[in-house]
Amino acid sequence: MKTEVKICGLKTAEAVERAVALGASHVGFIFFPKSPRNIEPDDAGRLAARARGRAKIVAVTVDADNDGLDEIVSALDPDVLQLHGSETPERVLSIKALYGLPVMKALAVREASDLERIDPYLGIVDRFLLDAKPPAGSDLPGGNGISFDWRLLDALDGSVDYMLSGGLNAGNIADALALTGARAIDTSSGVESAPGIKDLTLMEAFFEAVRRAEA
């Protein structure tokens, strides 16, 4: 499969094993108490051991302090840190210096002007995760099952390395790939039967849809 696929918000051994068997390039574990996909660092570490060496391990955090990051990095030994809060470029630099890990910075997109927020992070983050801006009043910065207008990415400089996220599922991934040319994609709620509950059948359908889109 040419497209990198990240399955995020994993909480069970069965889901981790299936994601990797289907061809996931990345598996994500979410450390954010307000999320239905939240997982304790030690539990995530045990699950990550099932994928290590076959998929990249991603720790997803939201404005975590150094003590929180220390615990997560120690337990999970991630390949990538995904920062999904309001972390500034300065904070990203500090985190990279502390842990020596690649950083993927999530940015919320609803309109063209939101893409201007990429510029201050260029040369600092290793990759962006472009997600849909959450609805008003939502406690979750991601995993809300909504998409943004993918045509906005037409204006994006082709040198910007990003992973596309936001409401991706088996029914829309072909259009998303065709419109954006994205080489890396992320899904969480799109392969769930309920918030935080991964559905293996939906996961299989998602990978099959990606393969058909690539054909």
Curated annotation (Swiss-Prot):
Top EC class for this record: isomerase
Signal sequence, start to end: none
The protein, known as: N-(5'-phosphoribosyl)anthranilate isomerase
Keywords: Amino-acid biosynthesis, Aromatic amino acid biosynthesis, Isomerase, Tryptophan biosynthesis
Family statement: Belongs to the TrpF family.
Pathway it works in: Amino-acid biosynthesis; L-tryptophan biosynthesis; L-tryptophan from chorismate: step 3/5
Organism classification: Bacteria, Pseudomonadati, Pseudomonadota, Alphaproteobacteria, Hyphomicrobiales
UniProt-listed CDD domains: PRAI (cd00405)
GO annotation terms (biological process): L-tryptophan biosynthetic process
InterPro entries: Aldolase_TIM, PRAI_dom, RibuloseP-bd_barrel, TrpF_fam
